[in-house]
Amino acid sequence: MNPLLDVKNLYVRFKTPDGVVTAVNDLNFTLNAGSTLGIVGESGSGKSQTAFALMGLLAANGEVEGSAIFEGKELVNLPNAELNKIRAEQISMIFQDPMTSLNPYMKIGEQLMEVLQLHKGYDKQTAFAESVKMLDAVKMPEAKKRMGMYPHEFSGGMRQRVMIAMALLCRPKLLIADEPTTALDVTVQAQIMTLLNELKREFNTAIIMITHDLGVVAGICDQVMVMYAGRTMEYGTAEQIFYHPTHPYSIGLMDAIPRLDGNEEHLVTIPGNPPNLLHLPKGCPFSPRCQFATEQCQIAPKLTTFNHGQLRNCWLSAEKFNL
């Protein structure tokens, strides 16, 4: 079976007055229909730029290189006219901040209906009925009444539900969720994750979940890709990454998760800061922060397969971590 999305050798670069920044560096992954890929990493690791590259939404000074094949169609450098036919209808995106992503001058109903009228050619009455139905699907109370309200009349969690409803209106085959639970309290986060799982089962939608919240990843993702400085550090199933991480950065992320059952008096952290993408260290970008770094790390490692398809970008053998 061919994957729904096949990304190979993806690069994203930005020309700045200080030089060229490589935000995404040789990214490779596949995604099947109905499955969920979590992309995790610190701020600036290239997670969101990967999504923008797939959607054709890079800033004016950005350029993309490589291949991203969606259902047999190459997305990279696809003309806007063709991209517009794919966006929303086949690939949708939930943007990072629900508090600012909706038009404050338009009622919620108008914004939802516009999607269906533009992409599906629905008349006003049909678009209204379908929008109410989708608001019901995302567990919006009094959905019909909410259609006549403005964004400022909604809480953050309610706005996020509207964003999810809008993204799913056209029944896309791929949903890209960029930090969908940012700025939401933990109760609402749990509701949103439950909702996405239900919608995935109902519509067989594939999801790319971009987040720095490892709890979110554990709750919804089948596959996980750990990114650092634009590169893949490790890639595998959620079980492999959470229970058998094989890269020092992945191990550091897992160790930094606060434990309710532990007796630790101090939180574990990864020393140092993410690198400046204009002045990356020689070789492995994580080496200045890695307690296991050796002279060999001055040469950039290659992604290698370790265990049942698990990939790692490190010179050190997995045996060093007793795995």
Swiss-Prot record:
One of its GO terms (biological process) is protein transport. InterPro entries: AAA+_ATPase, ABC_Ni/Peptide_Import, ABC_transporter-like_ATP-bd, ABC_transporter-like_CS, Oligopep_ABC_C, P-loop_NTPase. It is found in: Cell inner membrane. GO terms for molecular function: ATP binding; ATP hydrolysis activity. SUPFAM superfamilies: P-loop containing nucleoside triphosphate hydrolases. Its EC number is 7.4.2.6. Its main location: membrane. Gene3D superfamilies: P-loop containing nucleotide triphosphate hydrolases. One of its GO terms (cellular component) is plasma membrane. It is a peripheral membrane protein. It comes from the Bacteria. Residues 5-254 form the ABC transporter domain. Keywords: ATP-binding, Cell inner membrane, Cell membrane, Membrane, Nucleotide-binding, Peptide transport, Protein transport, Translocase, Transport. It catalyses: a [peptide](out) + ATP + H2O = a [peptide](in) + ADP + phosphate + H(+). ATP binds at G41, E42, S43, G44, S45, G46, K47, S48. Belongs to the ABC transporter superfamily. The complex is composed of two ATP-binding proteins (OppD and OppF), two transmembrane proteins (OppB and OppC) and a solute-binding protein (OppA or MppA). Part of the ABC transporter complex OppABCDF involved in the uptake of oligopeptides. Probably responsible for energy coupling to the transport system. This is Oligopeptide transport ATP-binding protein OppD. The gene is oppD.
